[in-house]
């Protein structure tokens, strides 16, 4: 039987036949509907093939994969759990505990600087001889820097890692310590696209390299930092593209052989939300896997509740994300997991070419500092950021638990953290949820007909309003319009939405508005335009609520109208 099975063959399906079947499934809509675009405008096709890859990239594929694999020095990565505490004693206790439970590095954020005791620094110095240290954004007055003076000169060559900050200078004895950070996180968190992130890293490098006479000495001093978002394949391609771009950059400085710099990635707070915080754990898992498959060397996973204040349990969850990846997926046994993927190779090349061109534009404008001072970067980032917020508001992109599937039973946790950033995608929803948690208007869904007919629209409206923190009640299912009119007249509510099946909406609303009580804000579920919509508004209907509408604008409109009613009694 098995020999017979081995003889089974399958007909080869060519692209043309696949496309023909795909077009039929679209039922008259154009094939181009299956093509989406990234925030940079790069087209994402529904199918990538070997033939298409060879046609568009040719021998570039081999060059890309060779570079990615040769410049990744190990097949694993360092688990770098960040430690945040209010005192040096707590910091050391938390750090020691995390190192015993799977953390592989000492991570200190100078933005959350604390006062250090001599005893704590002494304990830290001992650990630095065993574990790599990543201390970022230090200020000259930060007491943390004193630890480097406490390590015996004969032991300093054992210390490895990174320390960055203003006017931070280390003894030459620290031969394995890097002091320069090429950082794309700021533009990323402000809403940037991947092409801009990559180009900015190269521009920073070009400016910093001017202070060195030898490229190898320069390379030995730097680390590259990325924030990794939830766009899985795009983020994989970002890290891969950087390795190729860096090799090209190094070769232009006369470097021979393969050039490699360590990449430190962290989960992106741009995608984190204070709402339904456990969803952040899913985002962190997605982002972590993308970073690892992309080839990061060091990875920091932020706890799911980092925006409101992490605790021992959430830090454990964050650490376990990486431990699960290492122990249960074997991703640390392979270099360049996605190499050869038609989609990833194509996307990687797109980023390489576009980022290099943009980097050259920046250089022509005078380099990194001149470009920053010109305001051109902020203009570009702002445009991308506004598009991101618009996509979230119009539900073109999903933030689970925030702009879709909002859980009103989940408590809104209040709290602050030094890692709070200015342009998180969830912020507009968080503000609305916080507002309506304090005071809630009475909202009624005015349902007409059979449950099976009005339920789809009623469920949509309920979910739509929940994203802003608004709870709803259902009216009785009115069998007649007159029954609905009487109920509306005799029932107190602040805002109502008429929910009827699409087929019956026109008939029901036309009759309903003939005797609609004044002074009540009532919308219709569904998108209606033209003369019909105008007539309904003239008859007392306030507006409409529909799929694809700007949620934030609509929710703020409801909020504003209710505030006016409350204000004027």
Task: Say what each PLM segment does.
Residues 1-231, 261-262, 310, 451, ...:
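Catalytic alpha/beta active-site cores
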Residues 225-257, 262-414, 543-553:
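Active-site capping/gating regions of soluble enzymes
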Residues 219-221, 258-260, 296-298, 356-359, ...:
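Active-site lining segments that contact anionic ligands and/or coordinate catalytic metals
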Residues 8-11, 29-30, 35-36, 45-47, ...:
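Intrinsic disorder at enzyme termini
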Residues 72-75, 222, 265-268, 337-339, ...:
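A short alpha-helix capping/helix-coil boundary motif
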Residues 306, 341-346, 445-451, 484:
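A short beta-alpha structural unit
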Residues 17, 21, 120, 146, ...:
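Exposed alpha-helical structural elements
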Residues 322, 345-348, 352, 359, ...:
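Generic hydrophobic alpha-helical scaffold/packing signal
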């Amino acid at each position: 039987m098995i020999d017979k099975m081995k003889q089974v063959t399958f007909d080869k399906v060519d692209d043309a036949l696949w496309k023909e079947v795909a077009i039929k499934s679209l039922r008259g809509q154009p094939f181009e509907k299956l093509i989406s675009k990234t925030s940079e405008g790069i087209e994402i096709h529904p199918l990538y093939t070997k033939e298409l890859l060879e046609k568009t990239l040719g021998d570039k594929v081999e060059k890309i994969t060779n570079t990615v694999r040769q410049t990744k020095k190990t097949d694993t990565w360092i688990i770098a759990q960040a430690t945040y505490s209010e005192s040096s004693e707590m910091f050391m206790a938390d750090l020691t505990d995390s190192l015993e439970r799977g953390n592989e590095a000492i991570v200190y954020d100078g933005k959350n600087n604390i006062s250090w005791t001599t005893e704590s620094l002494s304990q830290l110095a001992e650990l630095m001889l065993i574990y790599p240290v990543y201390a970022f954004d230090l200020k000259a007055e930060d007491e943390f820097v004193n630890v480097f003076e406490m390590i015996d000169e004969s032991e300093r060559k054992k210390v490895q890692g990174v320390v960055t900050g203003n006017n931070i200078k280390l003894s030459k004895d620290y031969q394995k310590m890097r002091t320069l950070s090429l950082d794309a996180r700021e533009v990323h968190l402000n809403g940037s696209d991947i092409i801009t992130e990559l180009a900015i890293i190269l521009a920073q490098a070009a400016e910093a390299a001017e202070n060195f006479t030898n490229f190898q000495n320069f390379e030995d001093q730097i680390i590259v930092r990325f924030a990794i978002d939830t766009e899985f394949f795009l983020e994989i391609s970002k890290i891969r593209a950087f390795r190729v771009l860096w090799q090209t950059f190094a070769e232009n400085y006369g470097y021979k052989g393969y050039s490699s710099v360590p990449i430190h990635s962290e989960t992106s707070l741009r995608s984190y939300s204070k709402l339904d915080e456990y969803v952040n754990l899913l985002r962190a898992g997605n982002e972590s896997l993308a970073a690892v498959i992309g080839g990061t060397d060091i990875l920091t996973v932020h706890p799911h509740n980092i925006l409101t204040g992490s605790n021992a349990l959430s830090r454990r969850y964050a650490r376990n994300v990486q431990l699960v990846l290492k122990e249960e997926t074997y991703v640390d046994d392979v270099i360049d997991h996605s190499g050869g993927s038609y989609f990833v190779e194509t996307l990687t090349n797109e980023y390489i070419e576009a980022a290099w061109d943009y980097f050259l534009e920046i250089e022509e404008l005078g380099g990194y500092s001149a470009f920053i001072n010109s305001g051109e970067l902020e203009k570009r980032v702002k445009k991308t950021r506004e598009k991101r917020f618009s996509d979230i508001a119009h539900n073109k992109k999903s933030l689970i638990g925030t702009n879709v599937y909002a859980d009103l039973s989940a408590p809104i946790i209040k709290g602050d953290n030094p890692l709070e950033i200015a342009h998180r995608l969830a912020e507009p929803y968080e503000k609305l949820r916080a507002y309506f948690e304090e005071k809630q208007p009475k909202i009624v869904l005015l349902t007409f007909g059979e449950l099976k007919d009005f339920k789809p629209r009623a469920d949509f409206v309920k979910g739509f309003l929940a994203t802003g923190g608004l709870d709803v009640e259902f009216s009785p299912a009115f069998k007649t319009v007159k029954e609905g009119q009487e109920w509306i007249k005799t029932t107190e509510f602040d805002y109502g939405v008429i929910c009827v099946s699409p087929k019956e909406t026109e008939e029901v609303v036309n009759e309903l508005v003939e005797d609609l009580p004044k002074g009540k804000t009532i919308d219709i579920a569904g998108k209606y335009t033209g003369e019909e919509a105008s007539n309904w508004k003239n008859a007392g209907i306030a507006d409409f609520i529909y799929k694809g509408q700007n949620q934030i604008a609509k929710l703020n409109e409801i909020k504003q109208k209710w505030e006016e009613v409350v204000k004027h009694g």
